[in-house]
Amino acid sequence: MKKFLIALLFAPLVAFANTGTAHIDKWPGSVSDKAALQNGAKLFVNYCMNCHGASYMRYKNLLDLGLTEQQVKENLMFTSDKIGELMRVAARSDEQKLWFGAAPPDLTIIARARGDAGNPAGGADWLYTYLRSFYRDANRPTGWNNLVFENVGMPHILYGLQGQQVMNHETHKLELAVPGSLAPAEFDKSVSDLVSFLVWMAEPQQEYRRTLGWFVLAFLAVLFVVAYALKKEYWKDIH
């Protein structure tokens, strides 16, 4: 609980980190699409968890995505053999500081941290754009830069899927120089699925909360009608 409160305290600092001036695209995904969430979980485990952890999420929570315990153990668990374990990164923080200069942030609530009070869902849009905006930059230590987050220390972990983009300095737009294993539309869909998982992970009960909210509103509406009818019946003899 102490670590979780600290993460919430520092989340706004992550949101205000150095960002570029690129146009932020609208995330086309949804947390109600179980197939997208399952694919996003697979991408997260295979690509993101090499450096980033999700230390406030347990592997058993992935069962809520419609996966069986066997599927989770066989396809999504590489750093632990217990489904009740937290989704921690295998590398130690001191090793990561040595490699990257700073330990990569935990991603459990990154989708919420990247939003803001005026647009809490904006974190999904930012992540969707950021993960598609890496380009080759020989002046950076990793060989990569990002149109959304200038001089970011993170390399392009998905370049095998997307390929290698370069900056056209005349148009200030990115162009695909070396194709990846996925077509551009397929890559965009994969990133959307990954963001779906990140959004779900930041608040796993959001779909239940929304559904429950509609039931509560419906109950209050019925209660209002009953209360109004009772009020009229009670006061008719007085008036």
Language-model segment annotations:
Residues 31-38, 42, 117-125, 181-188:
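Soluble non-cytosolic domains of exported or imported proteins
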Residues 56-123, 141-170:
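Gly/Gly-Pro-rich "capping" loops immediately C-terminal to redox-active cysteine motifs
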Residues 139-144, 206-211:
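Surface-exposed patches in mature extracellular/periplasmic domains of secreted proteins
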Residues 209-239:
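Juxtamembrane interface at the cytosolic side of transmembrane helices
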Residues 44-55, 194:
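The canonical Cys-X-X-Cys-His
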